[in-house]
């Protein structure tokens, strides 16, 4: 486990550094060709550099369009971050869960409506709305209104 953790942390650092340097397109290609990278999203979104976190959000927005099925791979690493001590991590995780659109996040996001941080509360509400919107649109498209 130790070796895998070290490799993951090295890869998280590498991806974050590339994101900070503006290599979003390259990172999109990496994720599209290796779905095993999705579990690293939870580690990446905890980076203290704003440019990295904004880039990870852009990455997930783009991958939601290009690689819809595989973005679910980020879900398990993001859900526990809704209880993180740092408000920016809770908020960013909530935002990414909204982008992913998995209904399994709804109960945990509902709890954030009572978060001590106003920004986190707002982001959680927006994420909940986004998930409902995505599923309403999917129901309309499939005829399951």
Question: What are these regions, as identified by a protein language model?
Answer:
Residues 2-10, 32-46, 65-81, 102-114, ...:
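Amphipathic alpha-helical scaffolding segments comprising HEAT/armadillo-like alpha-solenoid repeats
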Residues 13-33, 46, 51-69, 88-102, ...:
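Structural detector for internal amphipathic alpha-helices that build alpha-solenoid repeat scaffolds
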């Amino acid at each position: 486990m130790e070796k895998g953790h070290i490799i993951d942390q090295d890869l998280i650092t590498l991806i974050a550094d590339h994101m900070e340097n503006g290599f979003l397109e390259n990172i999109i290609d990496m994720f599209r060709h290796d779905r095993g990278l999705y579990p690293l999203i939870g580690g990446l979104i905890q980076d203290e550099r704003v440019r990295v976190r904004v880039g990870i959000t852009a990455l997930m927005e783009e991958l939601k369009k290009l690689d819809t099925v595989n973005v679910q791979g980020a879900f398990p690493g993001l859900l526990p971050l809704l209880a993180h001590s740092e408000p920016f991590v809770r908020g960013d995780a909530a935002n990414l869960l909204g982008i992913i659109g998995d209904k399994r996040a709804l109960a945990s996001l509902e709890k954030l409506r009572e978060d001590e941080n106003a920004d986190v509360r707002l982001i959680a509400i927006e994420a909940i709305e986004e998930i409902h919107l995505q599923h309403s649109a999917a129901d309309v498209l499939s005829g399951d209104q």
